[in-house]
Design a protein with these regions (language model features):
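Flexible, solvent-exposed short loops/turns enriched in glycine
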Residues: 26-56
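Glutamate identity and glutamate-enriched acidic tracts
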Residues: 23, 33, 37, 62-65, ...
Length: 76
């Protein structure tokens, strides 16, 4: 896990989930986990720059439903 995600993971624990980038792909971390729970087949370099920036900073989600809503944007 890169340092940016490590720094973002602790504050995200209260919210439950964090979407970010792991080894060039969109990934999902669950609270308390050092490794991604799921790595999606979405290459970060294929996303628009604004999306890549958001993911590199980490996108917090309080529920799995919110995660799926966020992911729908990247699968389109």
């Amino acid at each position: 896990m890169n340092r940016t995600i490590s720094k973002l993971l602790s504050p995200a624990l209260a919210l439950g989930f964090l979407l970010g980038i792991h080894e060039g792909r969109v990934a999902l971390w669950r609270d308390g986990e050092a490794r991604p729970e799921q790595i999606y087949d979405i290459r970060a370099d294929t996303l628009p720059p604004a999306d890549r920036l958001q993911l590199s900073r980490g996108i917090r989600a309080e529920s799995r439903e919110k995660v799926w809503l966020l992911l729908e944007n990247y699968f389109d």
